[in-house]
């Protein structure tokens, strides 16, 4: 009988410790959820319906890229050579851009980083896009509110003539021209 009492007391103690630890974990998870909610408050890029900001720059080949000169739908891609997901997404972006209805002139790819590090990306993208290399606070990233890489957006002119985002996260497996 004393052995049974000891076992029941031990199981009861273990259950109590488990309950206290579980409640502690739940409390910490709530704190982390609140912290993550505050950090994730800002969007990572312009959202659908938002106007593309002004940009006036040139591609690596010297082609002028000015928001007011954009005439049709444009696919924007943003990549960083230091970003592993960017390396994974780059071949799919290149393949998707190859089938854009407007061809190379309807695709603008921005590589964020120094020119030497960006050279490999520029080489792959130049066939299918007008490529810009800029710093993290560059004109293209600012115009589209980019805060994360990789980012792929599509913009078109609205009825009032403004260039607005129509797809804030282009699915590269979808045929070109289809929006969300």
Language-model segments: residues:
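Long, leucine- and charge-enriched amphipathic alpha-helices
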Residues: 1-47
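Short active-site neighborhood of thiol/selenol oxidoreductases, capturing the structured segment around
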Residues: 66-93, 110
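Structural motif
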Residues: 78-81, 110-114, 135, 157
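Structural microenvironment flanking redox-active thiols in thiol-disulfide oxidoreductases
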Residues: 90-125, 137
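Short, internal strand/loop/helix patches
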Residues: 124-151
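Non-catalytic, surface beta->alpha helical segment in thiol-disulfide oxidoreductase systems
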Residues: 147, 153-180
């Amino acid at each position: 009988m004393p052995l049974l009492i000891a076992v029941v007391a031990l199981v009861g103690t273990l259950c109590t410790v488990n309950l206290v630890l579980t409640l502690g974990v739940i409390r910490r998870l709530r704190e982390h959820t609140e912290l993550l909610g505050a950090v994730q408050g800002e969007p990572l890029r312009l959202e659908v319906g938002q106007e593309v900001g002004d940009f006036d720059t040139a591609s690596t080949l010297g082609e002028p890229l000015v928001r007011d000169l954009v005439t049709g739908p444009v696919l924007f891609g943003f990549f960083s050579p230091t970003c592993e997901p960017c390396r994974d997404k780059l071949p799919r972006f290149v393949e998707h851009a190859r089938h854009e209805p407007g061809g190379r002139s309807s695709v603008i790819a921005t590589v964020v980083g120094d020119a030497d590090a960006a050279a490999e990306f520029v080489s792959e993208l130049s066939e299918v896009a007008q490529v810009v290399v800029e710093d993290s606070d560059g004109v293209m990233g600012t115009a589209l509110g980019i805060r994360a890489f990789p980012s792929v957006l599509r913009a078109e002119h609205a009825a009032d003539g403004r260039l607005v985002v129509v797809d804030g996260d282009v699915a590269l497996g979808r045929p070109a021209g289809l929006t969300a």
